[in-house]
Amino acid sequence: MEPGNATVSIEEAKLLQSSLQTAYGSTPAENPAIYRDLSPFSLDERFGNNEQWLKDVAVRTYHDIDVNWRIKERGQSVFYRNYVPSSELINRLQKMGNERAEFMQTYQTGYRLNGQRHPHSWSIIDAEECVQWILGVWER
């Protein structure tokens, strides 16, 4: 895990490790087998191919990809960002024939209600379009 050099990134990494330790009694580094079984996907193909269970499921991942903001504000490169494995997940699903697997990329759309820039904000999703997509999936 690369937390970066920003305080918010370090605190986020600590919170995640603590949550995993509490929930599963170990971290992924300490007991990778638990996380292999729990994870729907891993970049490391040695940890199974759990994405196979999603090959017939409509899947979307949404990401506000602003590399310069990440570097400047969080001290983080793209290497450890969640859009890297998400894009590989979508790629693998499409290679399996899943035409309903989509990587939804936005740029500089993530803002909290108070105006604070944050790439994990719900504002990265076009709500109306997403609802229409969900309804289309249900009707299928």
Residue map of PLM features:
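Alpha/beta-hydrolase-fold catalytic nucleophile elbow
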Residues: 1-4, 62-64
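C-terminal catalytic histidine-bearing segment of alpha/beta-hydrolase fold enzymes
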Residues: 59-140
